[in-house]
């Protein structure tokens, strides 16, 4: 591209935080900082000896305080706009590395580095509200059509996974509603059971045997897959069908995906293959509500005329979708919604070698970001890995601080940011690497947006 006359930015940098560096440092009895900087020094010398035409004046390292200062500043800006939050969440827990793993880091049910059997565990995690941008992300894919391979655009659309449907509220005999998501409200009268995910909040209302079953189910690899044989357990609790007022059983099932929709689905075995397989296995009622003269299949998933559907009988199923939606909205038992497979991004990790999250927990119960004048919040150098896990959690002084605004005692957040957080923005920092007044300075305007990024 230089030979074609284009201005080419060819920088070099080091994606230097993370679990691999931390583990390697521990194995070599060095601090992660010394281990990482030593490796960077060696690699820099090797690359320079090869004569690559990198712009070394733009060199950055993600573990540099000058770099992660702006990452912390950005986190605080997101916090101010309510785009980051903390909640208890079911995660992939590596019992050897003592940290959360992303789904991509779990291979055949085992940790990608440790080889440990991954456990499902609920812990408090920080999340980035990527779901707030689901519609924008999907819409912007149209700008790639004709410029990117069709399979890449399709893959992205499927990853975001937009679904039009409805949320319906089912009352239960223990006075707690269960909300289900469905893309087929026209099959509402065919519901003969409800299935919930093993981590659904409703499980807390169940007996100890159900809770133990769910814990075991969550630790099975099959729980994260849509394929495989159906498996479930009756909770002993019934819901009330919002239309027919019949009692329908509530089951835990392995084919209800955790983290998608509401974590609860309505079982319509005559018109959904998974529901049908589940109903056959556990001898549950099968109610046909859509007829089609062209097929006598046990499971019909297409369109047709409604039957066994009260006042909606004989309606075409496509028309019935709107009619039933209007009815449930009028009766205040449901609403029309868009759902997405895209989930909010869990960005915190229970390890030392990462960017400190600039949050404090004040003694009066307030959770708030540090004052921006305190940035960067630096990692301590005097760390002890002998106790295992995250040494920040056990540090005798670093985690204890005071709120600058009130003077009240506070404890620092001891989780650090996922390394993908660092690598999500360094391409922009390359364009103004030495700016000490802003995350991305005016110098970047010359380069951004780029025509080609490799």
Explain the meaning of each model-derived region.
Residues 130-163, 191, 196-233, 373-402:
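Amphipathic alpha-helical
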Residues 178-200, 345, 351-358, 416-430:
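Conserved phosphate/anionic-ligand binding catalytic regions in large, soluble enzymes, centered on
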Residues 160-164, 185-188, 229-233, 242-244, ...:
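A short catalytic or substrate-binding loop motif that flags glycine-/basic-rich loops and adjacent residues
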